[in-house]
From Swiss-Prot:
GO terms for biological process: glutamyl-tRNA aminoacylation; tRNA modification. A motif ('HIGH' region) lies at residues 16-26. Zn(2+) binds at C105, C107, Y119, C123. Belongs to the class-I aminoacyl-tRNA synthetase family. GluQ subfamily. PANTHER family: GLUTAMATE--TRNA LIGASE, GLUTAMYL-Q TRNA(ASP) SYNTHETASE. It comes from Photorhabdus laumondii subsp. laumondii (strain DSM 15139 / CIP 105565 / TT01) (Photorhabdus luminescens subsp. laumondii). This is Glutamyl-Q tRNA(Asp) synthetase. HAMAP family: Glu_Q_tRNA_synth.
Length: 316
C-alpha cells in the first residue's frame, strides 16, 4: 500500500479545462473540492488546464471563472494557467531523459489498438530519433493500487499499471499525466479531489511522483453525474452550462447529490450563508462511492446512490 506524506497546511484545488463552460457535473467536483478545503481550514486553488489548444473553446476559461464566482466559490491566491508552464514541463522532461526514464516512440494509435489497446514497449530499446515521435515514461516501479479516502483501496489492472505511458505527444503537446503531477507539486497540493473518471490515471501519476521524489497527495474521487442515458455529464456530451440566475437551488442539488445534510430552511439563506452552513456540516463519510443523477434540464434533477466498491478496470 502506498501512503502519502503531507504537510500540516491543507491545500486543495479545482483544475477545469477550458474545453467548454462549467456544467453540473463539474460544479459537483468544484463544490466537493471547495468544501473539503474549507472544512479542513485550508486553501482552495484554481488552475486552468489549458494544455490542449485544439480542444479549447474561446472565452471558456473566463466564463468558468465567472460561474465559480457567481456560485460563491471564491479561490485563494492567483490562478495558474498551464499554458504558461511550458518551461517547467520541459525541465522535467529533460530530467527524465537524463535519468534514462523516457524514450521516443513512433507507434500509432491504430497499431496499439490492434494489440488489444495496451502499449507493448515496442520502441523501448530502439533509440529512435525525435522526429514525429511521442515521448513515453519508462516504467521501472509500477504502482498497482492506491488508497482513496472515499473509495478505499483501489487495485489497478496490472497490464495498465505496467504500461509505458505517453508524457509528451507527437504533436508537441504535453500529456495530462505529466503536467498534473508537476503542477500539483508546484502548487503544494496536499489532497486531490476530482471525479471517479480520473481514478485510472492516478497510479500512473503516483509512479511519476515516486520517480521524481515528490510528495504524493491524498486522493478523493467523487461520484459522477450522469445524464438520462447513463452517460457522464461532460462537455464532449454537450452538457448544458449551469445557469447564472439564483445559484442556491443548484447548490442544494449538488449538496444532495453528495448526500450532505440539507436543512429545510437552507433555501431561505443567502448564497454565502448556504455555503457557510454546508462547510460546517460537511461530512466526507456521507458521500456515496457511486452516484447516479438523471438530468432532463436544469430544473429537473433526480438523484440516486449506489455504495458498491469499485476497481480500476476500464481503459481511458
Amino acid at each position: 500500500m502506498i501512503k502519502s506524506e503531507r504537510p500540516q497546511a491543507y491545500i486543495g484545488r479545482f483544475a477545469p479545462s477550458p474545453s467548454g463552460d462549467l456544467h453540473f457535473g463539474s460544479l459537483i467536483t468544484a463544490i466537493g473540492s471547495y468544501l473539503q478545503a474549507r472544512a479542513c481550514q485550508g486553501k482552495w486553488l484554481i488552475r486552468i488546464d489549458d494544455i490542449d489548444p485544439p480542444r479549447e473553446v474561446p472565452g471558456a476559461a473566463s466564463r468558468i471563472l465567472h460561474a465559480l464566482e457567481h456560485y460563491g466559490l471564491h479561490w485563494d491566491g492567483e490562478i495558474l494557467y498551464q499554458s504558461q508552464r511550458h518551461e517547467a514541463y520541459c525541465h522535467v522532461l529533460n530530467q527524465l531523459q537524463q535519468q534514462g526514464l523516457s524514450y521516443y516512440c513512433t507507434c500509432t494509435r491504430q497499431r496499439i489498438h490492434q494489440i488489444n489497446g495496451f502499449y507493448d514497449r515496442n520502441c523501448r530499446e530502439l533509440n529512435l530519433p525525435i522526429d514525429h515521435a511521442a515521448i513515453r515514461f519508462k516504467q521501472r516501479h509500477p504502482v498497482y493500487g492506491f488508497e482513496d479516502k472515499l473509495q478505499g483501496y483501489l487495485n489497478a489492472d496490472p497490464v495498465m499499471a505496467e504500461e509505458d505511458f505517453i508524457i509528451h505527444r507527437r504533436d508537441g503537446l504535453f500529456a495530462y499525466n505529466l503536467v498534473v503531477v508537476i503542477d500539483d507539486d508546484y502548487q503544494g497540493v496536499t489532497e486531490v479531489v476530482r471525479g471517479v473518471d480520473l481514478i485510472e490515471p492516478t497510479v500512473r501519476q503516483i509512479a511519476l511522483y515516486r520517480q521524481l521524489n515528490l510528495k504524493i497527495p491524498d486522493y478523493i474521487h467523487l461520484p459522477l453525474a450522469l445524464n438520462k442515458d447513463g452517460n457522464k455529464l461532460s462537455k464532449q456530451n454537450h452538457a448544458q452550462p449551469i445557469p447564472l440566475d439564483d445559484p442556491r437551488p443548484l447548490l442544494i442539488e449538488a449538496l444532495s447529490f453528495l448526500n450532505q445534510s440539507v436543512i429545510e430552511n437552507w433555501q431561505d439563506l443567502s448564497r454565502d450563508q448556504l455555503l457557510q452552513k454546508a462547510t460546517a456540516h460537511w461530512d466526507l463519510d456521507r458521500i456515496p462511492r457511486q452516484g447516479k443523477i438523471h438530468i432532463d434540464n436544469m430544473n429537473k434533477v433526480t438523484v440516486s446512490h449506489n455504495n458498491h466498491s469499485q476497481k480500476i478496470h476500464s481503459r481511458l
